[in-house]
């Protein structure tokens, strides 16, 4: 069952996945996975894990914590082989227990398998119940185990056919890296909701949630895994097959607003440039008088720079970030979360005192963090604070791998822009429109899931019905 958790004023990414098949014996695949996961740490901070295959079996290690907290040289030294996969997790389905950390490992008729998953299934409970009625026993509460169990049950037909069978049954988002004793497989859901890319370093191949992880291990970007594609890497090289896909892909638009690292390129779109363009479009037609544009570090800085470039208002630093403080959303009580905001961010008093500020952030979820930041800037002597958001108001929950508040907790679901402005204490508030946000990622040929903004989900979260399917 999906666990309902108290979270802070951010939409948080669920997971990051990484895999490498080394043809070069000089490559230490456990170390490569470590550095790849470190580059993807922004996608999950609750747990980390690595599984390694040596042609005979699979060894793995996973635990709660950040990548450098989970792994040391001794642990990595014990993970020997020529293929590895890794995972960083932020739970959206299932609890935080170490048993839910990934990769998950299972033994089936063709040997051991390990699986790492970024995404979320909307029919996981129904599938789990059906399999339990058939006698299946589940060890975890995560939907990843449902996927792995479906593959294992059909594995006697061949691993690729088992994957195809799984893809016919599950509904939701998934970017998967699957490890067998002699192969690495990358799988992307038919809508391509979650990102997955392919890279190459020498004669070895790499799979990762974002291209920044390829850079971290010295791999060259080859291409993105396509929606509905199954990429198989083994001793014969790389080959792929596809399942039937919808008429439109639906990549998560919020990847470009907040989740992805700015140095990544996803489905041909430069994340940093898309954020700068969002800031520029946010400034068009905005006639507010101000002395300085500042951004909330780190995800809103590119948009703030874009706003400054378009408006002609000078860009400056107004907030300092303590990078050694845990994220505010992990605090269980509202009072502790608000204390966490003050500990994590602090106003640069000399920079903001007496100034009329344009404060740019990427999104507002509950509004509590925005209110604290506005209050902080006013306490530091800011004369005016005009908040500008480089995305539309978040009106609906995400069902496809992002941890969001419920509809009732989303401030944009029940309050107008004017009411939100009063709640956060800003002098004015403006959101980027959805058409303008879509223009920041235009030209790639991609289409996007915009459900959190307008309710247009590619899959019905209640029934699992898929849209845009040819009869």
Residue spans of the language-model regions?
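Conserved short alpha-helical segments that host acidic/polar catalytic motifs at enzyme active sites
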Residues: 2-227, 232-290, 296, 384, ...
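Extended, hydrophobic alpha-helical segments in both membrane/secreted and soluble proteins
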Residues: 293, 300-307, 311, 315, ...
